[in-house]
A protein has these predicted regions:
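Basic/aromatic DNA-contact patch characteristic of tyrosine site-specific recombinases
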Residues: 1-139
Length: 142
């Protein structure tokens, strides 16, 4: 997934809410000189390099106008994205992102801040375990 980034934005609910989808340009000119359109734009946040927020980005979808928090990380020599959540004004914002990321970053990185486990893979494993538990519960109760 090749995604181009834009200028850094402040990690603040007001700064995120100020971004208006109508003001954004999703078009670009490719090497052949044709005008193409992106499905999303990605904006990195202006956060300290040594914080748990390192690699956090705001993804704005063209079709829906949704603002999503993504965490970009390197694991096994490859860049990957973890979807942290969707920005919902008044109920889900920067404080909730910090609360969700703290245990994930602590359990998936070493002392140097290098990723030792992928949060994407961990989430998939947890979902499979939950499905097995639900199947076992309903199979034993009937």
């Amino acid at each position: 997934m090749k995604v181009r980034t834009r200028s850094k934005i402040k990690f603040d609910n007001k700064a995120i809410d100020k971004i208006n989808i109508d003001d954004l340009d999703f078009s670009f000119v490719n090497k052949a000189g044709e005008v193409k359109f992106r499905r999303q734009l990605v904006f990195p946040f202006d956060v300290p390099n040594k914080s748990i927020l390192k690699g956090l980005k705001l993804c704005i979808q063209k079709s829906t106008g949704s603002k999503l928090f993504w965490l970009q990380f390197w694991f096994n020599g490859k860049a990957d994205y973890y979807s942290v959540g969707k920005r919902i004004p008044g109920s889900w914002g920067v404080n909730e992102v910090e609360d969700k990321l703290l245990p994930i970053v602590r359990s998936h990185t070493n002392d140097k801040g290098h990723w030792i486990k992928s949060p994407v893979e961990s989430e998939k494993k947890k979902a499979l375990e939950d499905q097995r538990l639900i199947k076992f519960y309903f199979a034993s109760s009937s």
